[in-house]
Amino acid sequence: MTSHDQSYRAGEAKGRTEEKTNQMIGNIEDKAQAAKEKAQQAAQTAKDKTSQTAQAAKEKTQQTAQAAKDKTQQTTQATKEKAQDTTGRAKEKGSEMGQSTKETAQSGKDNSAGFLQQTGEKAKGMAQGATDAVKQTFGMTNDDQDKDHFPTNRH
């Protein structure tokens, strides 16, 4: 029986060894699977984090670009309004100056006309006086006319 016992014990030892080996292989496979899953989770987490960071950067860039665009439009509009206002005021000032110049010219024209009329009347009066003086000097005057222009005490 010894050989049978030895054979039995050897079979038992072999069975236990196989069982332990299978357990160890199972444990190693479980640990390898867990490590694989953990690595996949870490990779997915890193991928998600990278994607989120990229999306946040994209949104921030879009917001910054939109803010710059809005600011540029506001500045452009303000500049346009300022230019229109300045142009309007310049036109208004030019119109006022033109009207003032027109009024000044009209006043000068009126003054010149009045001055020329007065000068003409004075020259006419002086010429008439000179004519009358010459006529009287040469005795060519009518006595009735002389009374009006050269009153004397001849009554």
Curated annotation (Swiss-Prot):
Which segments show compositional bias classed as Low complexity?
A: 40-78
Keywords (alphabetical) are: Repeat
Q: Where is the signal peptide?
A: none
- Show the coiled coil region(s): none
What InterPro entries does the entry give?
Answer: LEA1/2/D7/KIN2
Q: Which ranges does the record mark as transmembrane?
A: none
Q: Where is this region: 2 X 11 AA approximate tandem repeats of T-A-Q-A-A-K-E-K-T-Q-Q?
A: 53-74
Identify the stretches annotated as sequence repeats: 53-63, 64-74
Q: Which family does it belong to?
A: Belongs to the LEA type 4 family.
What is the protein name for this chain?
Late embryogenesis abundant protein 2
Q: What is the lineage of its organism?
A: Eukaryota, Viridiplantae, Streptophyta, Embryophyta, Tracheophyta
